[in-house]
Amino acid sequence: MTNTRKTHPLVKIINHSFIDLPAPSNISTWWNFGSLLGLCLVIQILTGLFLAMHYTSDTLTAFSSVTHICRDVNYGWLIRYMHANGASMFFICLFLHVGRGMYYGSYTYFETWNIGVILLFAVMATAFMGYVLPWGQMSFWGATVITNLLSAIPYIGTTLVEWIWGGFSVDKATLTRFFAFHFVLPFIITALVMVHLLFLHETGSNNPSGLISDSDKIPFHPYYTIKDILGVLLLILILMTLVLFSPDLLGDPDNYTPANPLSTPPHIKPEWYFLFAYAILRSIPNKLGGVLALVLSILILMLFPLLHLSKQRSMMFRPLSQCMFWILVADLFTLTWIGGQPVEYPYIIIGQLASILYFAIILLILPTISLIENKLLKW
């Protein structure tokens, strides 16, 4: 008798991806974040769908429609805060997932890695446009400041910005198109995730040692399905604790004031997960230079496969590289802190030093240390 799970055209795909998938026997909890990101995406799409049923993308009613969702819609407050804090959980998982890839050398699967970087850009774009939708003060001014950066592009800059705005300032046309894009992008992200998995399953998963694990594989189910369920429960626990006890912990109080083009908030800053990039942007006194640094701060991830000069794939047996990696992590925390501070002494200089260090570690220090470690192997 044939097993439907292995022969049915549709079920067969699921079987090869999540049930009979050969997985390394030693992958740690750091490999849980892929499935958690999948869960985050599902949560965001579902809560977003229900929010879209009650939201109106008009400058006159957007703010009130969000208030209406929180006050009058059944469990609307829960859906709204799950969506807002779900974005934070999404980015926490993303940063940990990327960090895991950097530490264990997963970027040597460069198709999977590059699709992942494109996914990171897509999620950041989606989150930015979603933040504009409630049409509070920070929504409006955040949209104005960030879209205005494109005017730094030589020759076509101003025209491009006005084309994105759909007028001469951030207004009704901008809000409507941001809503349209915010709705459609998660589905594009879902398609990209499938491509990401397709490329991953061509090679199989990496593992903490960075060594080929073909001789020691175990089936994904039940071993890693059970392990993933633990991660899922912990993620839901953290998310629901945040949503039910302090839903506004990570938000900005300014966004509870309706958008007013005539009054600028004292400190314009994005959500916490963009602060590191915002700090890099602000650390360069030139507009175009800042924009380039902002884009490069994420785009630099695509260079990782080229900058890998070590004879070992993972950092597991490379103490000098490990040390530098954790300095990079500390540097990113510093940048995140600086991004939320006002532009004044000493924050300006700290931000500039942290930005220089960020690029120096990735482009110069880590590759150099890799070469030193290669030499040490021969001793």
From Swiss-Prot:
Subcellular location(s) per record: Mitochondrion inner membrane
Residues given in the record as heme b b562 binding sites: H83, H182
Entry binding sites for heme b b566: H97, H196
Cofactor note: Binds 2 heme b groups non-covalently.
Cofactor(s) this protein cannot do without: heme b
Note: Heme 1 (or BL or b562) is low-potential and absorbs at about 562 nm, and heme 2 (or BH or b566) is high-potential and absorbs at about 566 nm.
A biological-process GO annotation: mitochondrial electron transport, ubiquinol to cytochrome c
One cellular-component annotation, GO: respiratory chain complex III
UniProt keywords, alphabetically: Electron transport, Heme, Iron, Membrane, Metal-binding, Mitochondrion, Mitochondrion inner membrane, Respiratory chain, Transmembrane, Transmembrane helix, Transport, Ubiquinone
Record GO terms (molecular function): metal ion binding; ubiquinol-cytochrome-c reductase activity
Domain of life from the UniProt record: Eukaryota
Chief location: mitochondrion
Name of the protein in question: Cytochrome b
Any Pfam family the entry gives: Cytochrom_B_C
Transmembrane segments: 33-53, 77-98, 113-133, 178-198, 226-246, 288-308, 320-340, 347-367
Binding site for a ubiquinone: H201
